[in-house]
């Protein structure tokens, strides 16, 4: 796909305007708020084919391709669940469609992954990409879901990349792109240690000096043997009690985590339904629909509450009225 070319001003200098293949000139546009350059690239080329062909890359090849294009150090397909790589791909294909300053390249938690995918969804909408992003599946870090999406994105990249140079490190403006942790690692799986290694008698057995040949070892008295065996049994019981308590605590935490995840998925589904309704009625130029879309796609905590000052003013206005009633 040939890319746009830049025209020259009458004095022969580059004026950063863009001329398309059909001769239409698109003037250079600049965001006055953030001072970022944004070019109008038109609509993206949508890709609908998801069938496996000879061009489909293996998981090792596709991770090597991702690392090579955007200078990352991913080792597994599952690490694409953070969404950061896709955000940088969109900045590479369509400069100005996404702000990399808001992308969390060091994301480690699921809500940070969702934040990145919200930015990706907004860039898809801005470039009229029809692909539905299965966010609730991708952020789980499952291999097959992430492999299917990156294979589709590779075809989307091939259909829209025009061969222009791009420096991913410079585009991130110094942000360290740390790979997310392996989703397969469970925080509850602690390394198992043998009970013999943790027993208080194990260290004593190892540290006891070897008896010299020919010398008769002295036998400990019955009182010492009884005291040592009693202390060892008490230590074993204490350790067993502690293990039981920790297992109960882990079980309760797992139940709490499952409940939170179900609640999150429930509200995420509601927000997704609201988003689809807003997109269906987005062409009607309804102010309420636009305000809802702004709240849904807000990437900053403060951007999602633009009406809080007005609410405070209404409270202050109602207080004198209540005093007059008394």
UniProtKB/Swiss-Prot annotation:
UniProt PTM: Phosphorylated at Ser-235 by CK2 leading to enhanced cell adhesion. Phosphorylated by CDK1 and AURKB during mitosis reduces the binding affinity of MAPRE2 for microtubules.
GO molecular function, one term: microtubule plus-end binding
InterPro entries referenced in this protein's UniProt entry, alphabetically: CH_dom (IPR001715), CH_dom_sf (IPR036872), EB1_C (IPR004953), EB1_C_sf (IPR036133), MAPRE (IPR027328)
Segments forming domain Calponin-homology (CH): 56-158
SUPFAM superfamilies with a match to the protein in the record: Calponin-homology domain, CH-domain (SSF47576), EB1 dimerisation domain-like (SSF140612)
Residue ranges occupied by any EB1 C-terminal domain in the UniProt entry: 235-305
Region (APC-binding): 258-301
Oligomeric form and interacting partners: Interacts with DCTN1. Interacts with APC (via C-terminal). Interacts with monomeric and polymerized tubulin. Interacts with SLAIN1. Interacts (via the N-terminal region) with BAG1. Interacts with ASB14. Interacts with HAX1; this interaction is essential for epidermal cell migration.
Its job: Adapter protein that is involved in microtubule polymerization, and spindle function by stabilizing microtubules and anchoring them at centrosomes. Therefore, ensures mitotic progression and genome stability. Acts as a central regulator of microtubule reorganization in apico-basal epithelial differentiation. Plays a role during oocyte meiosis by regulating microtubule dynamics. Participates in neurite growth by interacting with plexin B3/PLXNB3 and microtubule reorganization during apico-basal epithelial differentiation.
Protein name, entry field: Microtubule-associated protein RP/EB family member 2
Organism classification: Eukaryota, Metazoa, Chordata, Craniata, Vertebrata
Gene transcribed to yield this protein: MAPRE2
């Amino acid at each position: 796909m040939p890319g746009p070319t830049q025209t020259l001003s009458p004095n022969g200098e580059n004026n950063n305007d863009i001329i398309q293949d059909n001769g239409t000139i698109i003037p250079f546009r600049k965001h006055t708020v953030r001072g970022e350059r944004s070019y109008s690239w038109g609509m993206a080329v949508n890709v609908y084919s998801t069938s496996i062909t000879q061009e489909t890359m293996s998981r090792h090849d596709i991770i090597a391709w991702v690392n090579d294009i955007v200078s990352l150090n991913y080792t597994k397909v599952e690490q694409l669940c953070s969404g950061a790589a896709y955000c940088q791909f969109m900045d590479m294909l369509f400069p100005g469609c996404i702000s990399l300053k808001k992308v969390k390249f060091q994301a480690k938690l699921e809500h940070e992954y969702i934040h990145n995918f919200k930015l990706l969804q907004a860039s898809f909408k801005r470039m009229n990409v029809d692909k539905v992003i299965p966010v609730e599946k991708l952020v789980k870090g499952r291999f097959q879901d992430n492999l299917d999406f990156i294979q589709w994105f590779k075809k989307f990249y091939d259909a829209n990349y025009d061969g222009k140079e791009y420096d991913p490190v410079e585009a991130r403006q110094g942000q360290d792109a740390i790979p997310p942790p392996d989703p397969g690692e469970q925080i509850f799986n602690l390394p198992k240690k043998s009970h013999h290694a943790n027993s208080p008698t194990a260290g004593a057995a190892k540290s006891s000096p070897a008896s010299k040949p020919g010398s008769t070892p002295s036998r400990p008295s019955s009182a010492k043997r009884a005291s040592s065996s009693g202390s060892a049994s008490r230590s074993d019981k204490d350790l067993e009690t502690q293990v039981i308590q920790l297992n109960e605590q882990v079980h309760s935490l797992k139940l709490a985590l499952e409940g939170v995840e179900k609640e999150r998925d429930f509200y995420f589904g509601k927000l997704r339904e609201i988003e689809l309704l807003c997109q269906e009625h987005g062409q009607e130029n309804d102010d309420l629909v636009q305000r809802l879309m702004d709240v849904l796609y807000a990437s900053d905590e403060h951007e999602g509450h633009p009406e809080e000052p007005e609410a405070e003013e209404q409270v202050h206005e109602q207080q004198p009225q209540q005093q007059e009633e008394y």
